[in-house]
């Protein structure tokens, strides 16, 4: 009697060629139910993956076991801020113009209860490397191991099929990286 757990397929899919991450703040409880109904019509879990932040879950009077604010981290020469949002929407696709139109549709559906506060465009470079040439994801599990690592399993009815996301924004000093790469090559 194995129950099939449904999840947002975009979580395990390959990185799309283009994407837009939209972050929203809870502006008002009024109209929130209507906004979430609009969101549910647009979110298919593949071309639009969504994540609820702790403030939105609390506003809905719900509780998600394991959901908590990611702590800010500091160390020698390193500051990792913790920027929380009520709602995260990951628009995935192949065409930047189409993503822009879908983002506008999404923002209209969520207003006035949820207000956009940040947008980040993303893209896949080459075979999945970042702009420094580093191939990301080489340590990520694949197949059933990936599903076990990324998708909350059975026995947790409230969140079965869900995932916890920590979305990171990296700023690279490409000039410095290029200079170090050239210096390294000169010494080989």
Language model region names:
Residues 1-187:
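Long, histidine/aromatic-enriched segments associated with O2/redox biology
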């Amino acid at each position: 009697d194995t129950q099939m757990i449904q999840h947002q397929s975009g979580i395990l899919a390959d990185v799309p060629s283009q994407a837009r991450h939209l972050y929203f703040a809870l502006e008002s409880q009024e109209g929130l139910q209507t906004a979430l109904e609009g969101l549910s019509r647009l979110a298919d879990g593949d071309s639009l993956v969504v994540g609820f932040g702790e403030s939105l879950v609390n506003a809905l009077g719900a509780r998600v076991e394991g959901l908590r604010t990611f702590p800010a981290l500091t160390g020698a020469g390193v500051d990792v801020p913790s920027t929380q949002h009520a709602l995260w929407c990951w628009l995935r696709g192949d065409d930047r113009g189409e993503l822009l139109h879908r983002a506008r549709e999404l923002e209209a559906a969520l207003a006035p209860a949820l207000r956009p506060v940040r947008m980040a465009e993303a893209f896949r470079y080459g075979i999945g490397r970042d702009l420094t040439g580093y191939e990301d994801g080489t340590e990520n599990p694949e197949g059933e191991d990936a599903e076990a690592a990324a998708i909350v399993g059975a026995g947790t009815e409230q969140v079965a099929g869900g995932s916890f996301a920590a979305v990171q924004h990296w700023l690279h000093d490409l000039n410095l990286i290029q200079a170090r790469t050239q210096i390294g090559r000169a010494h080989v």
